[in-house]
Amino acid sequence: MDFFFEIHKDLPREGPGDSESTRRAFRKLSALPENPVILDVGCGPGAQTLDLAELSDGEIYAVDTHQPFLDCLQEKVEDQGLDKRIQVLHQSMKDLQFPPASFDLIWSESAIYIMGFEAGLRAWKPLLKPGGYIAVTELTWLKPDPPAEVKEFWNEGYPSMKSLEENLEIIHACDYYLIDYFVLPNSSWTDNYYQPMQARINMLLEQYHSDPDRLQQLDFEQEEIDIFNKYHEWYGYFFYIMQIP
């Protein structure tokens, strides 16, 4: 696990995403209070956290379990003079330490898969105030019957990945009102995630060329990039924007 974080060190994001998609999803929250209380779950180094601070005048709680990501975000928060509005906290998404009905908005980009889509939606729902929103991105099959190579890769990497229709059924079963959904563009995978990761992999391949264990991990990360380049029309990240009564 430590080497995984060495591979991902200093990446702009810890998963596919981009500021325009964050803004597009945020603009769907038509009844959000003027100064919302926001929880950013699995914030990573916090690119979307800072976007949320720009998009709202609210108070943001950004949580993650990897301290170097939190330290990176805390430094950015202080540099931008946002320390009175953004609290950076070491907490697990599986054990969030907040009272019920604490938040107007729960946000999570490229992270809910850690719990599972349905498990995350059910676990976080009590933290929302009445009429509160939740917006998450989730890896989703774009069409049925994917080729064996991509299916086998994601059966190992994320076996519970579902289709759009299945995820919409989960949202309904969890008693959320669906506001909107949209698929992230391919550039959200490449520009801020895979391109900088590829540069990092290339550097680490030279550094650890005689270390079989680390080379194996680098091969897995490289395979993920190669699979996307070959099969990106079969899967993608969807933004799902929901609200409770």
Regions found by a protein language model. Name each.
Residues 39, 47-95:
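Class I SAM-dependent methyltransferase SAM/SAH-binding core
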Residues 16-34:
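Conserved alpha-helix/loop element of class I SAM-dependent methyltransferases that forms part
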Residues 139-158:
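Short, glycine-/aromatic-enriched active-site segment of Class I SAM-dependent methyltransferases
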Residues 182-245:
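Conserved Class I S-adenosyl-L-methionine
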Residues 94-105:
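A short acidic, Gly/Pro-enriched loop at the edge of an enzyme's catalytic core
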Residues 160-175:
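Short alpha-helix
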Residues 119-133:
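A short glycine-rich, Lys/Arg-flanked "PGG" loop and its adjoining helix->strand segment in the class I
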Residues 105-118:
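A short SAM/SAH-binding and catalytic strip from SAM-dependent methyltransferases
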